[in-house]
């Protein structure tokens, strides 16, 4: 494959589809640069004294890792001065982050999970960053949380970075899904996969099976049928994969198919799932759909959900289209 940089790809996309104006290109280049900085911090590990907890909790009530806070600060500081954003929101912050008055205000809203899978940090398992870009309302002067509450179908860009054996950046601007790999010697993002496609059928599924006793009947039925293998109703064997890092699980599914499930369960009836809609489920759903897959909450398309609050949680079923449609049909039939 000819070496195509991220910048070249964005410029050519604008020429072909007129969907990446200069401000949006700047935003994506800044986010990509911030991901390089995070990758460098992750790569240092104990040598950089960035492992362990920070003795604090985020808005979700989760104990923060040092790298959670570092990654959040990197993304905020990289993006607030460029003039391309109206405001930002993060998993690590209870309220939105306003652009300081000394900087010009742009026309986009950026949401992110700065370090997904951070429970894996100390054991050297792949983690990543997830981000979503929305358009701000015309003439916006003082952004509020309500301005972020747009359905996922309104996203103009979604992407994630995986910090693993290689550092990769996967994104969609609404015209397919592209993967860029960080050339560590040159410091540049180089396209390594174009128009990624998820196979419609699969023999792999990803779910935290330790919660099986709490699953609702549709999820239990679906997983039990897969576990029955060739002697069961599916008449084929399945393998289970679970990394406990959404970016790593989804990246595997993008490359070789599969279904990722994080359902609601009976432990906390008032909590509809664990994953956050705005900066986890929505961007991943946009990417998966653009790669030919499907993404639902068990009842409806994730991208059609109208958010009610910034840190809203949802059940998630995404990946190979036929499998997502099957488990969704079990939910609708209950």
Swiss-Prot record:
Its main location: cytoplasm. GO terms for biological process: fructose 1,6-bisphosphate metabolic process; fructose 6-phosphate metabolic process; fructose metabolic process; gluconeogenesis; sucrose biosynthetic process. SUPFAM superfamilies: Carbohydrate phosphatase (SSF56655). Mg(2+) 2 binds at residues 113, 116, 280. The keyword Magnesium applies. GO terms for molecular function: fructose 1,6-bisphosphate 1-phosphatase activity; magnesium ion binding. Homotetramer. HAMAP family: FBPase_class1. This is Fructose-1,6-bisphosphatase class 1. It comes from Janthinobacterium sp. (strain Marseille). The lineage of its organism: Bacteria, Pseudomonadati, Pseudomonadota, Betaproteobacteria, Burkholderiales.
């Amino acid at each position: 494959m000819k070496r195509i940089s991220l910048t070249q790809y964005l410029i050519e996309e604008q020429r072909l589809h007129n969907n990446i104006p200069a401000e949006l290109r700047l935003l994506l280049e800044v986010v990509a640069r911030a991901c390089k900085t995070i990758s460098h911090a992750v790569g240092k590990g104990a040598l950089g004294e960035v492992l362990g907890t920070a003795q604090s909790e985020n808005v979700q009530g989760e104990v923060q890792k040092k790298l959670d806070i570092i990654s959040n600060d990197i993304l905020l500081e990289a993006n607030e001065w460029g003039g391309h954003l109206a405001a930002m929101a993060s998993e690590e912050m209870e309220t939105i982050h306003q652009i300081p008055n000394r900087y010009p205000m742009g026309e986009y809203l950026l949401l992110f999970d700065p370090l997904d899978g951070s429970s894996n940090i100390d054991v050297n398992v792949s983690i990543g960053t997830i981000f979503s870009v929305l358009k701000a309302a015309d003439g916006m002067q003082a952004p509020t949380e309500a301005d972020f509450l747009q359905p996922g179908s309104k996203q103009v860009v979604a992407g994630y970075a995986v910090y693993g054996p290689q550092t990769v950046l996967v994104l969609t601007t609404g015209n397919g899904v592209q993967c860029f790999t960080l050339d560590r010697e040159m410091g540049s993002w180089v396209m390594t996969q174009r128009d990624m496609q998820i196979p419609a059928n699969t023999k792999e599924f990803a779910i935290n099976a330790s919660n099986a006793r709490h699953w609702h009947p549709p999820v239990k039925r679906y997983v039990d049928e897969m576990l029955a293998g060739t002697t069961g109703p599916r008449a084929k064997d399945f393998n289970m994969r679970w990394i406990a890092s959404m970016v790593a699980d989804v990246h595997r599914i993008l490359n070789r198919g599969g279904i990722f499930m994080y359902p609601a369960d009976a432990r906390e009836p008032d909590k509809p799932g664990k994953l956050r809609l705005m900066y986890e489920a929505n961007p991943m759903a946009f990417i998966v759909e653009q790669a030919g897959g499907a993404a639902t909450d068990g009842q409806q398309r994730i991208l059609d959900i109208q958010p009610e609050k910034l840190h809203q949680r949802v059940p998630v079923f995404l990946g190979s289209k036929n499998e997502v449609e099957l488990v969704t049909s079990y939910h609708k039939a209950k």
